[in-house]
A protein has these predicted regions:
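Preference for intrinsically disordered or flexible, low-complexity segments
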Residues: 1-406
């Protein structure tokens, strides 16, 4: 990928220096806990991280579920294609709109029960709901959180009813062992258990998506409903044009980029140019050391500058920590709830960076999505049993600029 992250494009993503931003309001004061997390942050430098990059799909079949993809945008490739999350799990808890698919990460573990394992992230496309979400994520048990962003973990053993126990052939010929659930024709994400009463051919996950499909100017079901009913054919209508464009997520070890940068003093794609990081003090962090917010931002910039196109940071180590762009608004250990399935500890597994909004062509509008980082915490035991899709915990850090724009 060859992407020019010049200053103008960064501003469109609302990624900017924090030197002119006001402190975030509404978050509890966790100064003591933040001090503890600062000590741990130094350890994060020693833990290997895997970076994820958004690439256009190399072929039309690689994002199908039988190839166990990591992907962003488009529609999810459900691991268990039958027993999908349903009911309120699929909805934004604020506006009740069905959540939109953000990305999925294929992250198998050595345990047999997690031979196949994928994490799915969904979120409401409304920034207003994400702002309301900020207050909710600070709630601690037994208070119930309302969320506009949710993550689900699904895992399967090697022997399972859906896929062959052998590795899939890399030629597009691989087929799943069973068909999946019928999905909503509009979002292609959630189970389509509602059917158009007129043509009896088109399925929806909700009345909201049925209404959206009916009103759509680009692929209105109102126009073709009678034609489908008369023909007896299944729906071939395009999904919603509001879905984010689909990308494969390819992975590289961060250390490979660090070595490349150490051998090359210049980096044309760096978010922070080499001339800016090597000032009179010799280090951007020293330049910004007077301010916690600026220091945190500078550390974030410096860390990602070797691979500025990264959209995801992943680690299988339970000792790994997120790379926080903002000093305030970080969770402490008590803010991360225990697994609500087995009661075990949750730890950080991956984070989603705002660079992905560039690939999704998200504009800088009044209610446009923006975040500093999205950190996903999962059950350390990756517990099995119970529901096929277990909801995990996600923490969203916003920049104060995101808040002030609303």
């Amino acid at each position: 990928m060859d992407i020019d992250f010049e200053e103008e494009k960064l501003k469109s993503l609302q990624i900017s220096s924090l030197s002119e931003e006001d402190d975030e309001g509404g978050a509890p004061n966790n100064d003591a806990e933040d001090a503890d997390s600062d000590e741990i942050d130094d350890e994060e430098d020693q833990i290997p991280m895997t970076l994820g990059f958004a690439e256009k799909p190399k072929n039309p079949w690689s994002s199908r579920r039988q190839y166990f993809p990591s992907k962003a945008g488009g529609s999810p490739a459900w691991l268990d294609p039958i027993n999908l999350p349903s009911g309120s799990s699929s909805l934004c808890d604020f506006c009740s709109e069905p959540l939109q698919f953000l990305l999925q990460v294929y992250a198998p573990l050595p345990e047999e029960s997690a031979f196949h394992r994928t994490l799915f992230v969904f979120m409401c496309s409304s920034m207003s709901c994400l702002l309301r979400d900020q207050h909710e994520q600070w709630k601690r048990s037994p208070e119930v959180q309302s969320r506009s962003i949710k993550v689900f973990r699904c895992q399967l053993s090697r022997a399972n009813p859906f896929y062959s126990s052998e590795a899939p052939a890399e030629d597009g010929s691989q087929q799943p062992l069973t068909a999946g659930a019928m999905l909503c024709d509009w979002c292609r994400a959630w189970k389509g258990d509602k059917i158009c009463s007129s043509c009896r051919r088109v399925r929806y996950c909700s009345g909201k998506h049925q209404a959206a499909h009916w009103r759509s100017s680009s692929s209105s079901h109102k126009v073709l409903c009678q034609q489908l009913g008369a023909s007896g054919k299944e729906s071939e209508l395009a999904a919603s044009n509001s879905l984010w464009p689909e990308y494969e997520i390819t992975c590289e070890d961060e250390c490979d980029f660090d070595e490349a940068v150490s051998n090359d003093n210049g980096s044309g794609n760096a978010l922070v140019s080499r001339s800016r990081t090597e000032g009179s003090d010799g280090n951007l962090l020293k330049y910004f050391k007077a301010s916690d917010e600026n220091s945190s931002w500078a550390s974030f910039q410096e860390r990602i500058s070797s691979a500025p196109e990264q959209v995801l940071r992943y680690s299988s180590s339970s000792q790994a920590k997120p790379l926080w762009p903002v000093f305030s608004g970080r969770p402490s250990k008590p803010d991360i709830p225990r697994c609500n399935h087995c009661g075990g500890t949750r730890s950080f597994e991956f984070q989603v960076l705002p660079q992905i909004l560039y690939f999704f062509h998200v504009k800088d509008g009044e209610d446009s999505l923006d975040w500093a980082t999205i950190a996903v915490y999962t059950c350390e035991a990756s517990c099995e049993g119970g529901a096929s899709y277990k909801e995990e915990f996600v923490w969203v850090q916003l920049s104060s600029q995101s808040i002030s724009h609303q």
